[in-house]
């Protein structure tokens, strides 16, 4: 991206202040992005489109049209931003973990950035209960976004666990080594079009808030602010378009030919 595009991107996510090459700045950039740009699967669910991972296309979608996307889109564009800001950054494949569930394939894109002579895991494209900021790739506990995580460097990979009331829960692991952008193309295609893809079958829109979240699951909207939870259902495409515009800043047309 050129300087004008970088400035537009930073304006889109509401980021201001100095760009210091340290973990704190990475943390602030991640928070600015995830609290502004929705995680969403609308192109896949509504239109059956395989999202483009071309940086120019992503810039148009995210910055100009003020849309969101899923991990391959979000982290591809954010990776470009970090590199252009002077943070050496590469994409890596991540295996997401869920307690009691069968083993998932490697199907998530995360980022590893360098700053202060250290490696940091960065992720603006995880719609689940992952870290909402940088995780230093080291052994031990770290507080990220008010949540305690634990990192473990293993022989072949790096494991991230999340602390809960019931103990430690394995969240994800990955090998901190670069994966070429072209290698994410088949993963993107698979996640977009395989018949049981949750992104294809479900309408998903999430946005992180300072003290809560907004989430749309199919036709059910949930707003969480502190201890307050507000829920409602949308019944028509028109209501859905209004909700997407008002709650997520997404202005799209919902197809009328599909069963709603």
Name each model-derived stretch.
Residues 12, 84, 246-247:
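Residues at alpha-helix termini
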Residues 67-93, 111, 205:
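Cysteine-centered nucleophilic/redox motifs
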Residues 7, 79, 241-242:
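Short glycine-/small-residue-rich flexible loop motifs, especially phosphate/cofactor-binding loops
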Residues 3-13, 17, 35-38, 46, ...:
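His-Asp-centered catalytic microenvironments across diverse enzyme cores
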Residues 235-260:
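Generic C-terminus detector
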Residues 1-66:
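Secondary-structure boundary elements
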């Amino acid at each position: 991206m050129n300087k004008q595009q970088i400035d537009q991107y930073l304006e889109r996510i509401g980021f201001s202040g100095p760009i210091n090459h340290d973990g704190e700045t990475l943390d602030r950039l991640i928070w600015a992005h995830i609290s502004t740009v929705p995680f969403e699967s609308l192109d896949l669910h509504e239109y059956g489109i395989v999202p483009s991972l071309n940086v120019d296309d992503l810039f148009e979608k995210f910055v100009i049209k003020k849309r969101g996307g899923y991990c391959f889109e979000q982290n591809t564009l954010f990776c470009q931003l970090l590199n252009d800001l002077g943070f050496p950054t590469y994409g890596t494949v991540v295996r997401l973990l869920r307690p009691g569930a069968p083993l998932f394939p490697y199907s998530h894109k995360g980022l590893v950035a360098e700053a202060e002579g250290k490696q940091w895991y960065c992720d603006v494209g995880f719609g689940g209960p992952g870290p909402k900021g940088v995780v230093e790739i080291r052994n031990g506990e770290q507080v990220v976004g008010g949540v305690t995580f634990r990192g473990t460097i293993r022989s072949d990979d790096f494991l991230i666990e999340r602390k809960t009331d019931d103990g430690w829960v394995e969240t994800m692991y990955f090998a901190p080594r670069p994966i070429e952008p072209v290698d994410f193309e088949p993963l993107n295609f698979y996640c977009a079009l395989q018949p049981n893809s949750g992104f294809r079958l479900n309408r998903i829109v999430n946005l992180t808030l300072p003290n809560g979240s907004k989430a749309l699951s199919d036709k059910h909207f949930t707003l969480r602010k502190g201890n307050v939870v507000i829920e409602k259902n949308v019944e028509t495409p028109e209501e859905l378009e209004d909700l997407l515009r008002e709650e997520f800043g997404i202005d799209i047309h919902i197809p009328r030919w599909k069963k709603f």
